[in-house]
Amino acid sequence: GGIKIHHLDASSPEAASLIGMRRPDVVFHLAAFPRRAASIQDHGASFTRSLAVIEAARHHGVGRVVVALPATSLYGHPAANSLPVKESDPVPRGVRGVVARAVLDVLSEYREAEGLEFAALSLASVYGPRQAPAGGVVAAFNDALVSGEQPELHGDGRQTRDFVYVDDVVDALVRAADRSSGLLINIGTGQQTAVRDLWKQMSGGVLNDPTELPARRNELQRFAVSSVRARIHLGWSSWTDLADGLARVRSAG
């Protein structure tokens, strides 16, 4: 059979009713944290959505919830000698990070008090073909290359990120459906890539550098996550190197 898609607010009674009707073994909650939250209210909605999904899963006897959390917000500003950052070092950055940590705490409480198992996957910078331009710097750069427009970059481009390909992330999510229990698990490559080097790879080094804009307040300067726990508990590690992943993004247009 085919896949039926329901367009619902994850915090709505209709979404809870759908969980009750389908009675799944596992609920994947990937809608908690939109790429860009414009206000404190948006962050509050992230928590409300997550709590609603967790409670609906408990109420309808779901065995496990797999939740995606934003790694760059969860671990604050790690020192260079602490990279790639481990799961034992969460120091939330900004309201988004505080909310992500709160969701993790709620999951732990539901597991202890209600027996609802969970896996919380802390995702690095996920990218892939046909990603919306607002979805991340890879998508924004690709959109600029396709449209012929000059991309914009906040800061000097020396800031680093851990870019992990979407297919690899999907594999980790599927593995988390029946492995591990009550754990926060990083999903990333463990490798840092400077944003300006990313542009050089994508543009072939023959186009002008992006237009430099003022750095964002509280900008994260360097980041990568350790995937040791993922290898141990999920049997997972990233297999798509950045060059191959970017080639797939570019070929998809």
Q: Positions of the model-derived regions?
A:
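Active-site Tyr-X1-5-Lys
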Residues: P78-A79, R93-S122, L145-S147
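Conserved Rossmann-fold NAD(P)-dependent oxidoreductase catalytic core, especially the SDR/UDP-sugar
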Residues: H29, L51-V95
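A conserved pocket-lining segment of Rossmann-fold NAD(P)-dependent short-chain dehydrogenase/reductase
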Residues: S39, E87-R93, F118-V126, F141-V164, ...
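Flexible, glycine-rich beta-alpha linker
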Residues: L74-Y75, G94-V95, A119-G136
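Conserved active-site helix of classical SDR/Rossmann-fold NAD(P)-dependent CH-OH oxidoreductases
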Residues: S50-L51, A100-S108, A139-N142, D171
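NAD(P)H-binding glycine-rich loop region in Rossmannoid oxidoreductase-like domains
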Residues: L8-S46
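C-terminal substrate-binding subdomain of Rossmann-fold SDR/epimerase-dehydratase oxidoreductases
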Residues: L145-G253
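Short-chain dehydrogenase/reductase
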Residues: H43-G44, P92-L104, Q131, G135-A139, ...
